[in-house]
C-alpha cells in the first residue's frame, strides 16, 4: 500500500538566536513544538534544510530547538550543517497532514499561517492566528 499524501508540507522557520556551547550550537527557531508536535510526541525526525545555501559548514553539532522552555521543544540535531546566522530561514520538511492537525495553542502561541503552492500560484489557505483569537 502507498501513501495518499506522500512527502508534503514544509514548515518555514526563522533563526531567532544561536546559543553557543563547547561542542554544540543551539539554534533557537521561531517555530516550536506547538507548531510541529511529532518530534516531541514520538521522536519523529524531519529533514531540515537552509533556505539560502552558503556552502560553509559548521564544525559544531546544531541542536534545532524552539523558544518554549520545555525539554521536548526540540526538532533534531545535525552535524556538518551549513553555518547559520540569526534571521536565517530554514525549512523543516515533510510535515504533511500531521503538521497543522497536531498543532496547538500551547503557551498561548498562535497557529501558523497556511499557504498552498500549486505550480506558480500561491494562495493563503488560513491566516496566522492572532492572540485575541486564542483568548
Give residue ranges: language-model regions:
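Charged (often Lys/Glu-rich) extended helix/loop segments that serve as interaction or gating elements
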Residues: 1-135
